[in-house]
Amino acid sequence: MNHLDRIGVILAGGKSTRFGRPKAMVQYQERYFYEASLDALQHHTDQVLIISHPTLTNQFRRNEGIRVIEDDPRYQGCGPLAGIFTAIEKESAYWYLTAPCDTPFLKKEIYDILFSYLDQEPDKKAVIPVVNGRKQPLIGLYHRSCLAPIQSLLEQQRYKVGFLFQLVDTLFVEDKAFEQLHSSFVNINRPEDLSEWT
């Protein structure tokens, strides 16, 4: 299999328990939440992969040209780390650009900034934005070499993405431009969260 330089990965394998229905399929301003992630990623790669919850797979597959797969059965229900693992295991690339399915204001410029920092430190294996002192691991860049450490964490049932950063050389990016793009990092967990933006 030939390696692509980059693959976009939309993480949509969660249960949306707090929202009460699948967040990816909620509409804001006449488009689904996940479409903001799709738009942002498609500016940086020709291939976008959706890691889907089993109940949404058929709906996502209506998108022509978008590959849709479910979490590796060994790790279904184990959170975003399982989604990143599945993407790296199933699709061959050097870099995986991740995005959640519940960030309806995500902008492509976030990835421009992350890649600009990676260009300065190309040996890093993960590039993660930090906004107001908080790491944002679901909007990031992950090198294919993260596969083995992620699998090790999953086997140990250590499901927090943050554990990965203790194992791989990670670049944490704090950039003033994130202040103007702060809405990109707003994830919608409850219906009332969305009402604040309407």
Swiss-Prot record:
Known catalytic reactions: Mo-molybdopterin + GTP + H(+) = Mo-molybdopterin guanine dinucleotide + diphosphate
Keywords assigned: Cytoplasm, GTP-binding, Magnesium, Metal-binding, Molybdenum cofactor biosynthesis, Nucleotide-binding, Transferase
UniProt: GTP binding residues: 11-13, 23, 71, 102
Primary location class: cytoplasm
Binding site for Mg(2+): 102
Cellular component GO terms held in the UniProt record: cytoplasm
Domain of life: Bacteria
Name under which the protein is recorded: Probable molybdenum cofactor guanylyltransferase
Organism: Halalkalibacterium halodurans (strain ATCC BAA-125 / DSM 18197 / FERM 7344 / JCM 9153 / C-125) (Bacillus halodurans)
Gene name linked to the record: mobA
